[in-house]
A protein has these predicted regions:
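N-terminal "arm"/small-domain region of PLP-dependent enzymes with the aminotransferase-like
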Residues: 1-54, 190
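Terminal helix/beta-alpha structural elements that buttress the NAD(P)+-binding lobe
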Residues: 467
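Short, glycine-/Ser/Thr-/acidic-enriched flexible segments
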Residues: 29, 171, 224-226, 241-243, ...
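Conserved PLP-enzyme active-site core in the AAT-like
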Residues: 3-12, 78-312
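Short active-site oxyanion
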Residues: 70-72, 99-103, 445
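General small-molecule cofactor/ligand-binding pocket signal
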Residues: 73, 123-127, 350
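Conserved C-terminal alpha-helix-loop-beta "cap" of PLP-dependent enzymes
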Residues: 300, 304-448, 454, 459-463
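Conserved N-terminal alpha-helix of the aminotransferase class I/II PLP-enzyme fold
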Residues: 36-81
């Protein structure tokens, strides 16, 4: 598919034109780090991100065709901006029932959701992991049956949510059954909103697993996480049945939460990515996923030969193909210790916690990255002692968190209220102010407005959170 790159072409032409830059930015195109000649602002001909009529409009139209959406909008401020805009639009499109708006959301949500709730002043009813789940901060599998029950209960109470919000893929690579969840939402006329920050590439797999293709009403993608785009590049995607379709309204929602000085370096990167996606990217993506699947099988075969208590590489139908998630329990160590060992071998991971290590690959990783990783992991496997026990199932910790959770005030009241930082061990009974997170994965243990309980303290200590903000 032939693809234009209008933003890239305009900026390069301007950089070569010799025009006196009597406008922002202050570096005037003079190289300090090397990118400055291509760093411009919304000059004549450069279009406007939140009111495009020229090169940005053309580039977004290209992205829309590539993703097969009703409209794909650019963001230069990551999925965080898109999440806020998406929730604002869902609120705008929801029927008014005279009650406080409420969102039904899976508990493993990024803190951007809580910030949106504070800014837009809505409540959240949480979907929790089942008792059969393994027990991990990043995971919250939601079944169609669980969603049906939760939605039915809320509708019966006369408090239909303005949306259902799930994260898929999650930080550990788990994916939700989006088609099944979308069918449940459609039956109740509630939009399914997906934080697809880690899954922009899913559109370009042979089976097209992108949330919009699978029935979501809206979703956000962090292009920079899995596509060849610089940090900050993202998309807000709308399906044809999204609650708001008016382009001006959508751009207004993005502008509400965005800077009036969008980065043209990021816009050029998004624009250039269109040409990559229209080229041989799908073929290279298949090769990347196949290489990772081969690596998983090889590692798990070696782990089985060493009689490790669990597979080293997390695998299964509910795992996305382009993350390699390692279970450090297979090696008898913590995820953070495994990450340290990899770092000593010049392998930098995306995320590590007490049990797991997440490694993110893309088609841009050279073959030697796979080889080096496999060599190091096989060396670690060779040193595994005999008789390791299976790791303890931690689902009970999250069940206790759910049982003890009490919302003492709204999220908005907590985030905007007077607050103080206290050590975790002194926080019992206090009310959480700002979300308690480590970043990554930026997923809260205690939610703003909730009372800090013994279960919350135990989990915070397990995940290395030493202090938190509470209301005064």
């Amino acid at each position: 598919m032939s693809m234009t790159t209008p933003i890239v072409d305009f900026v390069r032409s301007y950089a070569k034109s010799g025009t006196a830059r009597l406008h922002m930015p202050g570096h005037k195109g003079q190289s300090l780090l090397g990118f400055e000649p291509l760093d411009i602002t919304e000059i004549c001909g450069a279009d406007e991100l939140y009111a495009p009529e020229g090169i940005i409009a053309e580039s977004e139209a290209n992205a829309t065709r590539l993703f097969g959406t009703a409209h794909s909008y650019y963001s230069t401020e990551g999925s965080s901006q898109c999440i806020r805009a998406m929730l604002f639009l869902a609120l705008q499109g929801a029927p008014q029932n005279g009650k406080r708006p409420v969102l039904l959301a899976a508990r493993n949500a990024h803190k951007a959701l809580l910030y949106a709730a504070a800014l837009l002043d809505f409540d959240i009813c949480w979907l929790w992991p089942s008792a059969q789940a393994e027990g991990a901060l990043c995971s919250c599998p939601v079944t169609a049956e669980a969603l049906t029950g939760a939605l039915h209960a809320m509708v019966q109470q006369g408090n239909t949510p303005f949306g259902v919000y799930v994260t898929s893929p999650d930080y550990l690579g788990g994916v939700q059954d989006i088609p099944a969840l979308a069918a449940v939402c459609r039956a109740q006329d509630v939009p399914l909103l997906v934080d697809n920050a880690h899954g922009a590439y899913l559109r370009f797999l042979p089976q097209n697993c992108h949330p919009i293709a699978q029935g979501a009403a809206m979703c956000c993608d962090s292009a920079h996480k899995t596509l060849p785009v610089v940090t900050g590049g993202a998309y807000l995607h709308l399906a044809h049945d999204a609650p708001v379709q008016d382009e001006a309204a959508v751009r207004g929602a993005l502008a509400l939460f965005g800077s009036t000085s969008p980065s043209y370096l990021i816009l050029q990167s998004l624009d250039a990515c269109n040409a990559v996606l229209a080229g041989d990217y799908p073929r290279r993506l298949v090769q990347c996923c196949a290489a990772l699947e081969g690596l998983r099988r090889s590692l798990n075969k070696a782990a089985a030969a060493r009689q490790c208590p669990v597979p080293l590489a997390v695998a299964g139908a509910q795992q996305e193909p382009m993350k390699l998630t390692l279970d450090a329990a297979a090696l008898g160590c913590t995820g953070t210790a495994l990450a340290d060992a990899l770092r000593r071998a010049q392998l930098e991971c995306e995320y590590a916690d007490p049990r797991y290590v997440v490694l993110m690959f893309t088609p841009e990783n050279p073959p030697q990255d796979y080889t080096r990783l496999q060599t190091v992991l096989e060396q670690l496997l060779a040193a595994v002692p005999a008789g390791l026990l299976r790791p303890e199932n931690r689902a009970g910790e999250f069940a206790a968190l759910q049982q003890q959770a009490v919302q003492r005030c709204t999220i908005r009241q907590a985030v905007l209220g007077a607050q103080v930082r206290v050590p975790v061990h002194k926080a019992l009974g206090r009310v959480c102010a700002m979300p308690t997170v480590s970043c990554p994965p930026a997923i809260p243990v205690a939610v703003s407005g909730e009372e800090i309980t013994p279960a919350a303290i135990a989990l915070m200590q397990r995940y290395g959170i030493k202090e938190l903000s509470v209301l005064r």
